[in-house]
Design a protein with these regions (language model features):
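Binuclear metal-dependent hydrolase catalytic cores
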Residues: 1-74, 80-82, 87, 121-127, ...
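Active-site flanking residues adjacent to catalytic metal/cofactor-binding acidic residues
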Residues: 76-77, 97-99, 131
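Charged helix-capping and loop-helix junction motifs
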Residues: 108-118
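Metal-dependent phosphoesterases centered on the DNase I-like endonuclease/exonuclease/phosphatase
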Residues: 95-98, 115
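A short, flexible beta-alpha/helix-coil linker loop
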Residues: 101-104
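An anion/phosphate-binding loop that grips the pyrophosphate of nucleotide cofactors and donors
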Residues: 92
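Small/polar glycine-rich anion-binding or flexible loop at a beta-alpha turn
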Residues: 112-113, 132-139
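Short, solvent-exposed loop/turn segments at secondary-structure boundaries
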Residues: 106-110, 140-141
Length: 176
């Protein structure tokens, strides 16, 4: 699954990096899907790609994933606060926000801790997971310290798991 025009773009990058060696594999072994929305085979999931707020050169988009149980996951991509995220958040069960900058200035293309807290206050019924975190992970003393966010907001670490059952109920399991 990739953006419209992505097959041509990725194929040309592969040709530049590995001339003549990947074309057959890309044509014969890869199933390309460049649709903006659709169904993920026999998984019970469908998706919709939507625009978010980041530098246009990065083709900024997020994905709304909807399970046949009604469970909705909103992955906002690399983005700052924006109307499209706000519009979709009210119907989501879980929202994944990137938090790429600390509260040291204005950064319209990234969420800061204050933006994430404000989002949580507007959408208290939604489980918020933070990724693309500017801060260091737990137990790492270098870099920016982990910001103090409300307990309702989970700052993802490598190894964390979101388990969704057959009824659309979910639990967040932190790494050991």
């Amino acid at each position: 699954h990739l953006r419209p025009g992505g097959r041509e773009f990725l194929s040309s990058l592969c040709e530049m990096g590995f001339p003549g060696s990947l074309a057959d594999s890309l044509n014969e072994r890869v199933h390309w899907d460049e649709e903006e929305s659709g169904v993920l085979s026999d998984t019970g999931w469908r998706y919709e790609r939507f625009p978010v707020c980041h530098t246009p050169e990065t083709d900024p988009h997020g994905y709304e994933l909807i399970h046949e149980t009604g469970f909705r996951l909103l992955h906002c991509g690399d983005s700052g606060p924006c109307e499209e995220i706000e519009k979709r958040a009210s119907s989501a069960d879980v929202v994944i926000l990137e938090m790429g900058m600390p509260d040291i200035g204005e950064f319209p293309h990234h969420h800061r801790p204050s933006d994430v807290i404000s989002f949580e206050e507007r959408h208290p019924e939604v489980k918020i997971l933070v990724t693309h975190n500017y801060s260091s992970g737990k137990g790492n003393e270098s870099g920016f310290p982990i910001p103090n966010l409300p307990n309702s907001i989970h700052q993802l670490e490598d190894g964390d798991t979101l388990e969704i059952d057959r009824n659309g109920n979910f639990i967040m399991i932190g790494k050991s």
